[in-house]
Amino acid sequence: MRRFLQICLVVLPLLAASCSPGSSSRRPPLVSFRPQDIPLVPRTVSQINREVRIDRDYMPTSTRARRYYSGSLSPRFITIHSTANPSGDACSHAKYLNKGKSGSLCWHFTVDQYHAVQHLPLNRRGHHADKGGPGDRYSIAIEMCEVRSHSKAKTYDRAAKLTASLMTQYNIPLRNVVPHYYWSGKACPGPLLDEKRPGYKWSWFISRVDYYYRCLNGGKQHVS
């Protein structure tokens, strides 16, 4: 992780400067980063999805979240979260959602070091970012697990691959890959923030997403 952080630049302008709650009327700020200088490994979307290992386990439509909070979705953003749960892996969160224990909360993917579980179809909204605001209405939500016994680096890398795949499938620019912080000011995803705000760690994650996007798209970037 330290090696990757060293190649990243400061976030300019820092996301925190323009990411106050309800800032959806503005375009997300560009995140400055240095593209990772490692050889590209060409992949197709199908190949990278197999690497991510996406297991579908959709929430029942009878749950409160699906009945009242899961309208139609045309994705424009990808919102990155972390679970803040040191003991729950992706399957644990799937069971939690499927039993309706989350109340109104629902999101699209939970990622751990081994796989990603998909909880919602990608044409249905989640309820995860800003209480029904634009973060919910227009974004795909990815939750990253924080299991103590898991490798953080593997979890982040799997999430970066998934993000790059979704960017490619839905023509979403890197600029529109945002932390939960962008929508609500919440310090989330906590492990990828610096002093509860986007900084070097978030810049590193964005550089990783950019690397996998270039692997999928013949070396081309889609920043803005």
Regions found by a protein language model. Give the residues of each.
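A structural motif
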Residues: 132-138, 206-208
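Cell-envelope and extracellular/periplasmic
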Residues: 135, 140-149
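N-terminal catalytic cores of peptidoglycan-degrading enzymes
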Residues: 19-131, 135
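Basic/polar, cationic surfaces and motifs that engage anionic cell-wall
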Residues: 19-56, 148-224
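Soluble periplasmic/extracytoplasmic beta-strand elements of cell-envelope proteins
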Residues: 79, 108, 141-143, 178
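Positively charged n-region of N-terminal signal peptides that target proteins for export
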Residues: 1-4
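Hydrophobic helical h-region of N-terminal Sec-dependent signal peptides
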Residues: 6-17
